[in-house]
Amino acid sequence: MSGPVPTTRQPAAPPRAIALMPAVLQHEWDLYHATWFTLMGVGGGIFLLARLLRLERGLGVWLGLPVVDLVSFAVISAGGLLLIWSLGRPLRFLRAVLKPGTSWISRGAIADFIFVALGGALILPGLALGGATSFARLPWDPWASTTLGRVIEGVALAAAAIVIVYAGLVLADKAAVTFWRSWAIPAQFVFSSLAMSMATVMLMQTLDGTPIESLECWLLAKFLALLLAVIAWHVVTRRTQPGKAEALARLHTVYGGLFWGVVITAGTVLPMLLAVLAALVPPTRDALGVAALLLTVAGGFLLRLLTLRVGYFPPVSGVLRVPKR
């Protein structure tokens, strides 16, 4: 006599994750921050490039001081004031500055202060007011021709480099927004800043009657080529990652015309081609330098603004479990 046929219990299907909250578009970072990022990049970049290429003497002197350095300090100061404005309250700014161990805003703000202070000290011996050079006895000069001057210049250059890169690191470092959490964001901002700065230096050469050399043109073209490569890498990799997928969809649909028309074509590819043409045809350099500045600044600013405006917090999903009785 046979007993009942035992039944085999099928293993329970693993619980499936369900969506708890969709991707949410961020609204805190916008126009002020894009302007701040742009000013910091250009302000630090023109000092860095002019000094490394030893062009500061050929970009004009006013009251015994290098004009390019004065422009750099003014742009950085404007960016710093905008940072304070964007944070809303002075005390909030102070709290942000006092966290260098965890905050790139704090590190960048400190670098801003060091840059302006040491850069200002570097050029101070050249100050001439009414024919008097009250600080000429200092053991260095604005052109860093002494050992102490070169040390001051070196620290100022290091601070300028941090000023250029920290805006991108603010976004990329531990960001909850997926589109920003990539090395490509600070890399884009750096190459864009260097391109805008190189074009600015070329314009200042034109205004001062200093010939633009082929080196400046080739550097501008290389910065833009590297920028284009990094942007391309960023938009074609990890396209399905939660948060980034929504960002790319918004970038291509809502801002597709600005992104492809202004950032990529007019702001990157066109000035890159103009820079190559200027390198090969010297008589065109002055005019093409002006055009390159207008195009790179428009493209660079919009690159930063669109990067902010397509930032999504990723969707949240989870598994609901019913406790066993």
Give the location of each predicted region.
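Membrane-interfacial segments
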Residues: 56, 88-92, 175, 207-208, ...
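Membrane helical hairpin/interfacial module
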Residues: 46-118
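Long, contiguous internal "core" modules enriched in hydrophobic/ aromatic residues
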Residues: 28-31, 35-42, 54-59, 102-105, ...
